[in-house]
């Protein structure tokens, strides 16, 4: 389509616009050109907070409304952040105000947007083909919803339920098209089959629909019950009977090899369910840890927010101080006032550009939808009065500003709704793809592991339980050993410290005694020299008798000194021998303690390795539990959808039966009337014949 369209506005009466507010008429009627081009939006949708509108803004608005509605050329680029630019680019498509119900077919809750539902009487191969076709159709529909606003008129034929006051399209065939579309959507509501259902129908044996709900474990935790839908228990028994009948009719026709495979798959499913019960305690622990971590995360986020607020407060104080310093000088105040005025003008200009752009967008969508006017209709159109002054609702800001602001608020709300819906659709698509991939992986795993027997599965379960119990016992033993090792290590350290202190004291005493011995030896040598010198002197000076008496005295003194010294030396030797013995014993104790510590360290390393292996096994089991929980939730959702569809089909069947009964009654009444009329005609003919014969 071209970028310009002729402006189309149909009028049947002169008072057609009596129910429309005056402020909305210029956006649709005052354009002198027949088309309005699409223009890029301004850079910033929220340039500044609200300020009182100036006379310049009123003049620009009045000129833009009374003149041409061609978009104003974009000014020089201002310094905007990346977020503002991306936000402005994302708001290029606006939802129209006058045709707000026109985009209702894009709403995710409508009939066309819902996924079709499987019809009851179809085979598995047809269901798989329908799944692939429906996936392709949904992808094409989603891509089509993201197209540009300029669309063909045939694409817009789905939304003919709109009763626009001032815009009536010419296409009268839209009601028929809408009815056909509704019939197609109602028929297509029975065309999709969930992957879980199709695969379960090829795997479940006879009577599995009746035995499967009873095999499920009754005691569940509160968290699992909250995740499952509460309505499953009410309709589980009749649904299982119906599904068992359907599946039994199918499985009777199949080969015995398929029956054996289904038996194996059912046994595998029972084993998996029993493993879920064993691993549920681990899931609880993980959830508690996740809650603790989430609480810590919230506290950290609160701290970050408080710090950011504190930083903002400091920045505001700095700006305030800078402004106070700038306002102190006269030139700075003039410059700041001029800058404020310039900023106000720029912000008002941006706001006016945004309003003009939105009005142009709405007008272009309107022109893209409706036909152009003929020459006669264009001649009859009069947006402004030919004679007299302009009406006040066209130029006075008191009338226009509230209407335009309300119009902008309405458009912003619509834009937010569109964005939220698109994000939800994208997230749902991603989740659906992940679920499909997980289902495929699970089915491949089940097909690979179908060769395992029930005994082996039970043995594996018992081994897993024993391993878990052993892990718990080992963990407790490790904790006890850690505590004992810490206590022993602390005791040994204290004893070693005491012994080392004693050794140091003994070594100090030994050194002091050795020093005393050396001093005494020196004194002994000095005494010997003096004795010899005195003896020589006495020999020359003293007589023999005197000398003998003196020598006897000296000998006695020497003997006494020697006895004392020998006693002291013996005591010191005894002490030294005792100290050496104690030192040897302490060294032996120290070596024994070191060997014991090394042995304990090796045991700790081995226990840590075993603990790591156990933790890895526990993490693998936790992941398996989470996968099984997600699969169970998906299965519950699919079952809920199937039950709702079954209820809808039963309701429609009852309605059709009532219609058929009423039609049969009407038919019988008509037949009785026809018979009575024929009888009356026969009687009248006989009477006529009788009258003819009489005449």
From Swiss-Prot:
GO cellular-component term (any): mitochondrial intermembrane space
Residue ranges, compositional bias (Acidic residues): 124-146, 178-189
Entry keyword set: Cilium biogenesis/degradation, Coiled coil, Cytoplasm, Cytoskeleton, Mitochondrion
Record field: compositional bias (Pro residues): 34-49
Main location per the UniProt record: cytoplasm
Coiled coil stretches, renumbered: 276-368, 406-632
Alphabetized InterPro entries for the sequence: CEP89
Record's compositionally biased regions (Basic and acidic residues): 251-271
Biased composition regions of type Polar residues, renumbered to the chain: 209-226
Residue segments, region Disordered: 24-54, 66-147, 167-272
Subcellular location: Cytoplasm, Cytosol; Cytoplasm, Cytoskeleton, Microtubule organizing center, Centrosome; Cytoplasm, Cytoskeleton, Spindle pole; Cytoplasm, Cytoskeleton, Microtubule organizing center, Centrosome, Centriole
Biological process terms in GO annotation: chemical synaptic transmission; cilium assembly; mitochondrion organization
Function text: Required for ciliogenesis. Also plays a role in mitochondrial metabolism where it may modulate complex IV activity.
Protein name: Centrosomal protein of 89 kDa
Organism, scientific name: Danio rerio
Source organism phylogeny: Eukaryota, Metazoa, Chordata, Craniata, Vertebrata
